[in-house]
C-alpha cells in the first residue's frame, strides 16, 4: 500500500448518528474527537477535505411528517440539527489545530459563514477543512443529496460515505452473518438493485458528475486515512 494518498480532494459524508456513539441522542464528544482525528490525519497527508454531517442524532424532518405535521418545517428543524453537528465537529478539529470553517446553506452570519462555491474553493486553497452545514438549504432533500451536490461543486475526486459497516453487503451483515461485502459496483447497479448506500437522487447526481462513492466504516479509527492511500476495507461505486 502506497503511503501517498490516491485522492487529493474528497468529500466525507458522516451521518448524525455516527456522532452519537453509544448514546441514544445528541453528540458524544469522544466520538466527535475521534472522527476529527481521522480528518486531521487526512489533512496531514495533504488531502483537501470537505465534510457533510447529517442531523439524525438531533432531529429528523420526516418524523414531523409521519405525525401529521408540516414536512417543510420538520426539514428546517433537521437542517438546524446539521448546523449543531457541524459546529461540534469544527470544535473538535480546532482542538487539534486544524484550520476549519463551517459554511451554512442557511444564512446565520453571527454563527458561521454562508455557503458559496467561491468561498468553498477559497477556503480549500488555504488548507482549511470545510464543513458544509444546513443540507442543501431546501426541504425534501437529504444530507446525502447535499453531499453529492457539494462534492460536485467543490470538484471532489470521490465521496467517502462513512457508515456503520465496512462497505456494501449482499444483505444486512448484522442480521445475516453469511452476507458478503461487495468490492465494486457501478452507480447504475446501486440504483437498479435498490441498495441503501445513499438515496437515489444522491447516487444519480454522483453518477452524472462521474464522482465515485467509497463506502467504509466511520467507526474504524484510522480507516479514513488508510482508504485514502488505497488500502482498507471498502466498497467502491464507480463507472470507471
Curated annotation (Swiss-Prot):
Activity regulation note: Allosterically activated by GTP. Inhibited by UTP.
Entry annotated with the keyword Cytoplasm: yes
Coiled-coil regions listed in the entry: none
GO molecular function, one term: UMP kinase activity
Keyword Ligase assigned: no
Keywords assigned by UniProt, alphabetized: Allosteric enzyme, ATP-binding, Cytoplasm, Kinase, Nucleotide-binding, Pyrimidine biosynthesis, Transferase
Catalyzed reaction equations: UMP + ATP = UDP + ADP
InterPro entries referenced in this protein's UniProt entry, alphabetically: AceGlu_kinase-like_sf (IPR036393), Asp/Glu/Uridylate_kinase (IPR001048), Uridylate_kinase (IPR011817), Uridylate_kinase_bac (IPR015963)
Pathways per UniProt: Pyrimidine metabolism; CTP biosynthesis via de novo pathway; UDP from UMP (UMPK route): step 1/1
Binding site for UMP: 55, 75, 136-143
CDD domains for the chain: AAK_UMPK-PyrH-Ec (cd04254)
Localization per Swiss-Prot or TrEMBL: Cytoplasm
Region of interest (Involved in allosteric activation by GTP), ranges: 21-26
Binding site for ATP: 13-16, 56, 60, 163-164, 169, 172
GO biological process, one term: 'de novo' CTP biosynthetic process
EC code: 2.7.4.22
Function: Catalyzes the reversible phosphorylation of UMP to UDP.
UniProt similarity note: Belongs to the UMP kinase family.
Quaternary structure note: Homohexamer.
Protein name according to UniProt: Uridylate kinase
Organism, scientific name: Rhizobium johnstonii (strain DSM 114642 / LMG 32736 / 3841)
Lineage: Bacteria, Pseudomonadati, Pseudomonadota, Alphaproteobacteria, Hyphomicrobiales
Amino acid at each position: 500500500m502506497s503511503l501517498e494518498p490516491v485522492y487529493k480532494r474528497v468529500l466525507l459524508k458522516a451521518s448524525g448518528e455516527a456522532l452519537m456513539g453509544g448514546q441514544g441522542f445528541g453528540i458524544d464528544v469522544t466520538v466527535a474527537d475521534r472522527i476529527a482525528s481521522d480528518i486531521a490525519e487526512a489533512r496531514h497527508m495533504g488531502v483537501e477535505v470537505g465534510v457533510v454531517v447529517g442531523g439524525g442524532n438531533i432531529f429528523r424532518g420526516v418524523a414531523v411528517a409521519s405525525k401529521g405535521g408540516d414536512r417543510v418545517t420538520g426539514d428546517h428543524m433537521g437542517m438546524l440539527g446539521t448546523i449543531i453537528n457541524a459546529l461540534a465537529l469544527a470544535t473538535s478539529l480546532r482542538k487539534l489545530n486544524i484550520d476549519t470553517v463551517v459554511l451554512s446553506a442557511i444564512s446565520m452570519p453571527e454563527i458561521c459563514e454562508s455557503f458559496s462555491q467561491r468561498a468553498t474553493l477559497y477556503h480549500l486553497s488555504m488548507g482549511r477543512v470545510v464543513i458544509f452545514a444546513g443540507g442543501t438549504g431546501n426541504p425534501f432533500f437529504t444530507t446525502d443529496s447535499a453531499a453529492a451536490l457539494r462534492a460536485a461543486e467543490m470538484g471532489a475526486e470521490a465521496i467517502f460515505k462513512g457508515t456503520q459497516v465496512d462497505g456494501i453487503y449482499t444483505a444486512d451483515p448484522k442480521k445475516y452473518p453469511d452476507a458478503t461485502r461487495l468490492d465494486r459496483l457501478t452507480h447504475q447497479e446501486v440504483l437498479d438493485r435498490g441498495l441503501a448506500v445513499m438515496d437515489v437522487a444522491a447516487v444519480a447526481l454522483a453518477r452524472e458528475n462521474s464522482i465515485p462513492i467509497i463506502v467504509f466504516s466511520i467507526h474504524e479509527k484510522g480507516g479514513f486515512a488508510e482508504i485514502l492511500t488505497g488500502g482498507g476495507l471498502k466498497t467502491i461505486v464507480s463507472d470507471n
